Amino acid sequence: MAMATRTLGFVLPTSLSSQPSFDRRGGGFRVSVIRCSTSPLTFPTSGVVEKPWTSYNARLVLEDGSIWPAKSFGAPGTRIAELVFNTSLTGYQEILTDPSYAGQFVLMTNPQIGNTGVNPDDEESGQCFLTGLVIRNLSISTSNWRCTKTLADYLTERDIMGVYDLDTRAITRRLREDGSLIGVLSTEQSKTDDELLQMSRSWDIVGIDLISDVSCKSPYEWVDKTNAEWDFNTNSRDGKSYKVIAYDFGIKQNILRRLSSYGCQITVVPSTFPAAEALKMNPDGILFSNGPGDPSAVPYAVETVKELLGKVPVYGICMGHQLLGQALGGKTFKMKFGHHGGNHPVRNNRTGQVEISAQNHNYAVDPASLPGGVEVTHVNLNDGSCAGLSFPEMNVMSLQYHPEASPGPHDSDNAFREFIELMKRSKQSS
């Protein structure tokens, strides 16, 4: 009978190639249990496991006057941002690297974060854009075959603050009842609570152009370097190629990945790229991407959208949806606490079907302000807010949520096929 081997403790592999394998000599399995961690756990004489990260006393001070003692991980210092909560159970690395979170602290309602570490494949952009991460418990151990480092090390390297050991459930209830709040995270004991409170009350995220901080600086051709295992819904394609210009207001990699998988050749352009220059490139369609902040803070983007309407088919996602709403003559407004998570039910008004969607936005389009001919195609079933638009006369479609997910369900991936069909019909009629 074959003997199973077991590795005890925590191994620091430079390569995570070790896998459970079949032992042909003995007819059984040889099992190795691997834990990825940048530092081994130690067991002092007290029997308490020491945390493998540097921790400081920290505070979260909110503009409503509440003070939440915490422990820190990641970078030390003092930062100010808007606090929002995210209800996703998984995908914290995608959330960390989503440019739409620029200017915000993200509180995860899932009580245990960090279990799977981080890896290069799950990033949605080249850096972390959120200001800080707020969690209940930071996992002591990290276990995943793709893991290359711990969450604490990852945040430290990117100069992002993280705090844990707070009552995140109580904070979430406060945000749900009172709305999003400006807060200050600090590890600096020399600063008084009153000083931090005054900081939180002297700053506002409304009206700030955050898109210019996250957009690319020059156009580039997007080449998908992702493992083919990411792909799905391959039977939905017609084998044709479509040239798409993607306006980068804070675009996520998986939006580009999904477009590419449907046969699109993508040129990504900055948020300030002139509409006339975009049209000179003779695209089959234009995508207006997701992005952070207030759509009213970027009138230059609204003007660009207006200039492109009716010229080629356009597709807006999240911020792109809001900019389209304004360009069509509608108004946007700031929501009480926004939608952030991977479990939001949305009804497709055309089919009656309900999709579970990934969402991340603090603003919404007021459907009552839209002109005639603009159809509200999707509605959020939690609060009845507008979740999708269509204006067939100008070949316009948009979604307030994220059909590419990452993280989140894939219920809405069909929206990319609908954009392909929109471009296809436009080419056939021209």
UniProtKB/Swiss-Prot annotation:
Compartments reported by the entry: Plastid, Chloroplast
Gene3D superfamilies: 3.40.50.880, Carbamoyl-phosphate synthase small subunit, N-terminal domain
One BP annotation, GO: glutamine metabolic process
Transit peptide endpoints, chain numbering: 1-35
Matches recorded under SUPFAM superfamilies: Carbamoyl phosphate synthetase, small subunit N-terminal domain (SSF52021), Class I glutamine amidotransferase-like (SSF52317)
Alphabetic keyword roster: Amino-acid biosynthesis, Arginine biosynthesis, ATP-binding, Chloroplast, Glutamine amidotransferase, Ligase, Nucleotide-binding, Plastid, Pyrimidine biosynthesis, Transit peptide
Reaction equations catalysed: hydrogencarbonate + L-glutamine + 2 ATP + H2O = carbamoyl phosphate + L-glutamate + 2 ADP + phosphate + 2 H(+)
Protein name (record): Carbamoyl phosphate synthase small chain, chloroplastic
Species for this entry: Arabidopsis thaliana (Mouse-ear cress)
Lineage: Eukaryota, Viridiplantae, Streptophyta, Embryophyta, Tracheophyta
Gene, per the UniProt record: CARA
